[in-house]
UniProtKB/Swiss-Prot annotation:
Gene: sepF
Function: Cell division protein that is part of the divisome complex and is recruited early to the Z-ring. Probably stimulates Z-ring formation, perhaps through the cross-linking of FtsZ protofilaments. Its function overlaps with FtsA.
Stated name of the protein: Cell division protein SepF
Organism: Renibacterium salmoninarum (strain ATCC 33209 / DSM 20767 / JCM 11484 / NBRC 15589 / NCIMB 2235)
Record field: compositional bias (Basic and acidic residues): 17-48
Compartments where found: Cytoplasm
Length: 172
């Protein structure tokens, strides 16, 4: 039983595969007899713990490469320099939209050339992208959307005025 448990632990990476490991026989396991004698002052030694796995000279160690992340927040002083306009033909063009938006570039997405199903999938993808990166998405026309990063403020018609006007005409 202990052998199977040990093999499982080695397989899962919870224990090192030690070639010199000798399992105890599963028969009687004896414990050392406990002594009732008082402990005598013994010399206390402080030793450094041995590492669980000592590297051998033949073992290969790969160099560590740092991960470079794209800047998620831009300085306010840098200003807005470009906007990407995308006319996707299929859902495969979502990569271009995602990469531009991730880099902090506002994206105008025109899905008029797409079928209903793919256009809906792409809008759903864009909504998730905007939510994950704390941006905003706005409908410009029926099938044109503006994806704005968190540091870009879109100034346009006053939404409260248009909501009041809509509620005025909706007197049902």
């Amino acid at each position: 039983m202990a052998g199977a448990l040990r093999k499982t632990m080695i397989y899962l990476g919870l224990a090192d595969g030690d070639e010199h490991y000798e399992p105890q026989p599963e028969g009687k396991q004896t414990r050392p007899a406990q002594k009732n004698e008082e402990y005598v002052d013994q010399e206390i030694r402080h030793t450094e713990p041995a590492s669980a796995h000592q590297a051998s000279e033949d073992e290969y160690r790969a160099p560590v490469t740092p991960i470079k992340r794209a800047a998620s927040n831009r300085d306010d002083s840098s200003g807005l320099r470009q906007i990407t306009t995308v006319h996707p033909r299929s859902y495969n063009d979502a990569k271009v939209i995602g990469e531009s938006f991730r880099d902090g570039i506002p994206v105008i997405m025109n899905v008029t050339d797409m079928g209903e199903g793919d256009a809906k999938r792409l809008v759903d993808f864009s909504a998730g992208l905007v939510f994950g990166l704390h941006g905003s998405i706005e409908r410009v026309t029926n099938k044109v959307f503006l994806l704005s990063p968190v540091f870009v403020e879109v100034i346009g018609d006053d939404k409260k005025a248009s909501e009041n006007q809509a509620s005025f005409f909706n007197q049902s």
